[in-house]
């Protein structure tokens, strides 16, 4: 009898293993956009779109050159060459409302450019130079006037003033911008990641712009450049950028932290804090999620850096406290969450804690996900704890960091999966991996990325993009990698996948809102 049970268990294990193997990602193409070598791919999440209306999706990706790739093969169709890197995700929209898509990017030469998506020729009025001598690290699109026309919002690394600018589709600078101007109330500094979110958190009928910067304050801006009022809890007449964010809300209310002795004052730095927008508790009101780099203010940043932690904020800058979930006190950091490396680029490139919101367990409430400099991917529930096997610690010898995740119900079974790429130390000869984990953080798949072409190591630092490529009914994941260009994998058994957070910053507007949450009935994404 025991032998029979053992045999049945063995068969069950084999069946489970076989099912897992059948779902292993399959490499479709690699080295997209490369020539005799591959340019370095940074944090720019690619796009999967049909640029010419022929019913077949292309891939648009950026390293230094911006490239348009055949979706089926990865062959280069168009190239806009440059020696200036692209950091923000590839933004795509019909800017001119002429039926033709535009692609909008920011570069480290201080320029932003809108291109015709099918030809990669600059649109009339572009490029613009919002931040001469500085890098465009953040770029998002938003319908600021609620009339169907998208404006382009950009953020730069300059620290003294004028960190955020807004442009019309024709490249004209919008009246009232840039901000902050010299003499404006509040505090802001440089923007060092894709740190712009756009949404109507205050129910005005028009979206607002929210931008964390290289301080412990968040800019809250109206479409005309004026600043958004903060809750009277923080004092009369204050705006968002005058209310500092701290670990303890009592310091927010008092207006400062006690930095006189080690351990007394803890607050976040938001230089790399790309925020997300969503209705976290399902009550019809939007909240903003931002993940901060918490540090001891006695020691300063980065010397006093402790860990990444999330904040949930309302439209008036107060902390989320609704539906039985009190976020006036934020989660307590878990053991082992200290930074493994920051700013030591000869060792490893930095992790970016882009915020992601998605309902992992199907209860109608959104969970909070981000990748951290502790070598883990975190997922918090609204009860301020990490469930199951979360956080997911990246396996391997030495240091490894993870890209911001994408989220989807891949197999249309009600179970949600989390997809991300990793990268190793720059001193290694490794490649990173493409990971798929389940909603409780258990690993389902791990596949090596392609060998490097032009460097000693390879990995994926940009958020994956999910979509349908020509030639298959299955969902694909496209990665922008460090040294193998754009790479595409087919995800078997996924023709009816439901995407929840399918690309960097949530969607091709790159403004912190989820692109979609619907089932593609024919598996083709149209």
Question: Locations of the language-model features?
Answer:
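Bacterial N-terminal signal peptides that target proteins for export
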Residues: 1-9
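N-terminal signal peptide c-region/cleavage motif recognized by signal peptidases
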Residues: 13-15, 19
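Extracytoplasmic/lumenal domain signature
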Residues: 20-518
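Ser/Thr-rich, Pro/Gly/Ala-heavy low-complexity intrinsically disordered linkers and tails
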Residues: 521-525
